[in-house]
């Protein structure tokens, strides 16, 4: 009988020892770190929330294309033209076409564009959208320009001038 009791006591002590060792809660949970820096992910144009007025659009467009400011009278006349046409996007297309058909537009030649496409893309983004392009944008435009031999700097400038992002500052 003594043997039976001692084996039960031994079993009981073993069970308590195992349970006390296996059921310990961590004192403080450790934060898992994978060596990645925390980064706020926002779109490149997140800071642009104010819509340009017609006068601002015309003045900035002319300055981007010619690197010279328009007179107040010219800005007023062109903005009146925009307001008189019901479709503002159509009016912008006409204004950009008229500006592009004038002499004095400062843009690289097609040979210069194709010689250094990356530089052309970065310069165009900084000139029109006032920001650096993302690597995805650079890759997209590089592939697009290489794949389409009919793309000219004039078409790229035209498309940037018509982009939705260009309407905001």
Give residue spans per PLM region:
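Bacterial N-terminal signal peptides that target proteins for export
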Residues: 1-10
């Amino acid at each position: 009988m003594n043997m039976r009791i001692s084996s039960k006591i031994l079993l009981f002590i073993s069970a308590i020892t195992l349970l006390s060792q296996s059921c310990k809660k961590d004192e403080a949970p450790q934060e898992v770190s994978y060596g990645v820096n925390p980064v706020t992910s926002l779109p490149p144009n997140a800071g642009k929330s104010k819509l340009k007025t017609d006068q601002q659009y015309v003045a900035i467009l002319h300055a981007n294309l010619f690197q010279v400011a328009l007179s107040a009278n010219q800005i007023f006349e062109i903005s009146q033209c925009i307001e008189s046409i019901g479709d503002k996007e159509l009016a912008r297309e006409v204004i950009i076409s008229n500006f592009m058909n004038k002499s004095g537009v400062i843009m690289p030649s097609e040979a210069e564009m194709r010689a250094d496409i990356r530089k052309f893309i970065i310069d165009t983004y900084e000139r029109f959208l006032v920001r650096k392009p993302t690597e995805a944008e650079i890759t997209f435009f590089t592939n697009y320009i290489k794949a389409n031999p009919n793309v000219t700097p004039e078409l790229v400038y035209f498309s940037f001038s018509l982009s939705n992002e260009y309407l905001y500052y």
